[in-house]
Amino acid sequence: EAQLEKKIVQFAKSLGIYTRKFTSPGHRAVPDRIFVSGGIVLFLEIKTPGKKPTQAQLHEMALITSVGGLVGWVDNFTDATAFLFSLRYKLTADLKRRCKNQQQEETQ
């Protein structure tokens, strides 16, 4: 997971996307990273390849979404680049669709 996160962060920076590690003392299961570009904020959970978010992480993602936030998760570099390209080039509709589709898949 750490190697994938490092690669994603390097890629985001190469696109001029601001990123920070997200921690919230007293709150578990928050997404790993915050990415910001063009006034759009994206929370992203980064998983080990083949792994999915825990129920607690899915719950936290649902809370973020319920207040209008954009949040998703990835377990590979290809999916991460799709999220980041959408963020960088303000493809907001695509970004929202990606986030919404993931959440629908997880609730099925």
PLM regions: where:
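Catalytic phosphate/metal-binding cores of nucleic-acid and nucleotide-processing enzymes, i.e., regions
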Residues: 1-108
